Amino acid sequence: MARISRAAYAQMYGPTVGDKVRLADTELFIEVEKDLTIHGEEVKFGGGKVIRDGMGQSQVSRAQGAVDTVITNALVVDAGAGIFKADIGLKDGRIAAIGKAGNPDTQDGVTIIIGPGTEIIAGEGKILTAGGFDAHIHFICPQQIEEALMSGITTMLGGGTGPAHGTLATTCTPGPWHMARMIQSFDAFPMNIGLSGKGNASLPAALEEMVLGGACSLKLHEDWGTTPAAIDCCLSVADDYDVQVMIHTDTLNESGFVENTVAAIKGRTIHAFHTEGAGGGHAPDIIKVCGLPNVIPSSTNPTRPYTVNTLAEHLDMLMVCHHLSPSIPEDIAFAESRIRKETIAAEDILHDIGAFSIISSDSQAMGRVGEVAIRTWQTADKMKRQRGALPQETGDNDNFRVRRYIAKYTINPAIAHGLSKDIGSIAVGKRADLVLWNPAFFGVKPDMVLVGGMIAAAPMGDPNASIPTPQPMHYRPMFGAYGKARTNSSVTFVSKAALESGLHGRLGVEKQFVAVENTRGGIGKHSMVLNDATPHVEVDPETYEVRADGELLTCEPATVLPMAQRYFLF
């Protein structure tokens, strides 16, 4: 039998079982767990390569079963499915098959048929992940959407109407008129989008109006008054209409303390935004709710991870975002009450043990929309350096930790918001919202972003050059971002009630509406993939020290991070 060295094989076809790959410049190393391609029967495109007529390409038409696109020999990194090598077949904008691609007339073991109508994306030596989902968006400016797309985000959920002061501070789109205008604008963007309506009301009628107007979730924000009455009313409407509720609790403890908020929630499922508290919430102990079985806790990325710069930048951010004045002592006291190094340090560790389930951005409102992936992996790297390997690791690799952290911005927000039937993981039947990465740039700069099976964004060189690579090389929208390809490739997520009421026709939009589902009692902390820990968390009211199941949670701030200036010269 002919043999080939591992190095030569990896160079031609990408890594296989037992090979390890470093993620960017972090200390995180993944190991290939299985390989669904067949050694000696690999398919590869190019001059003198396999995918040619009568060789790796069959005579099968699309109607007879050939797929639209194959991503060849990709290294899949997925929270649920694991870390493995495979060919990925796409059809009708969804993942049609995961396995071995080729020509069944000439090759054994083919599960994905390549035909004359099949396009090829070379995944050799590349990492493939599900598109990211940022579930904490302030829609302050439309340019955020392109910024997020170019970082590997393919779904955004949040609220707002533009740079209005309500939107600068809160992720709420108030009322059906604003809801309609925002949804109509979404036809312009190659991004899956869902809106959160304002959830602050003590009577249900106005909230029901927003859910019927297209909101796929409701947001309770302290700047609108997150009182026990508003919490109870909002959750009751959410239960009636099967939409998620996100909460930003009462930092000033004016209408009650964390215990009063928990009592008002009454055990119902809720997504707690920036649960550490720097982004807002009962001071100093909102972090305690991350141990409750009905609370899905998340972080926003400015506190990710804890560094020597974290505290200093937060005070100014907070003053701007919440319309505070540095000349008013009470405003300064409000801001300072939210920024605590002890709880931010504990947040790092709570992520590492899987007690915090989601990471999002808080775009332009104390968060950076293009850095969800970067901040997630910087946190994972910091925790490995400070805490070593996780006890769940089964080999000399970081596979479990990597799967835990990628879940935080893919499958877990998708489950929390009722979108996991369509997005969040690499699985047959789900939307082909996919991101291809060069391992050296993993989490920082994608090689290619697909939305609904079509390439929507990629780095591209001078369009007038003789080849695609000459400078200036930068991210540009691709054909999936234009015309009706854009509206046929991405969707708008709404409530089932809005979908069934005929809202799509009344608004005259082109993008398909997809209803969220299973956001209430059927899910909770136990539903969070690899991030379902429920420790008993306590906060010392004097020192702000955080303990989980009696253990003090503390760590040093990072002075140097990976995925930073090495990748961004300008």
Swiss-Prot record:
Enzymatic class: hydrolase
Binding site for substrate: 221
Taxon lineage: Bacteria, Pseudomonadati, Pseudomonadota, Alphaproteobacteria, Hyphomicrobiales
Subunit structure: Heterotrimer of UreA (gamma), UreB (beta) and UreC (alpha) subunits. Three heterotrimers associate to form the active enzyme.
Substrates-to-products reaction catalysed: urea + 2 H2O + H(+) = hydrogencarbonate + 2 NH4(+)
PROSITE patterns membership: UREASE_1, UREASE_2, UREASE_3
Organism for this UniProt entry: Mesorhizobium japonicum (strain LMG 29417 / CECT 9101 / MAFF 303099)
Residues the record lists as binding Ni(2+) 1: 136, 138, 219, 362
One Gene Ontology biological process: urea catabolic process
Protein name per Swiss-Prot or TrEMBL: Urease subunit alpha
Note accompanying the cofactor annotation: Binds 2 nickel ions per subunit.
Modification comment: Carboxylation allows a single lysine to coordinate two nickel ions.
Residues engaged in binding Ni(2+) 2: 219, 248, 274
Alphabetized CDD domains for the sequence: Urease_alpha
Compartments, as annotated in UniProt: Cytoplasm
Cofactor: Ni cation
Pathway(s) where this gene product acts: Nitrogen metabolism; urea degradation; CO(2) and NH(3) from urea (urease route): step 1/1
All copies of domain Urease, residue ranges: 131-570
Pfam families (alphabetical): Amidohydro_1, Urease_alpha
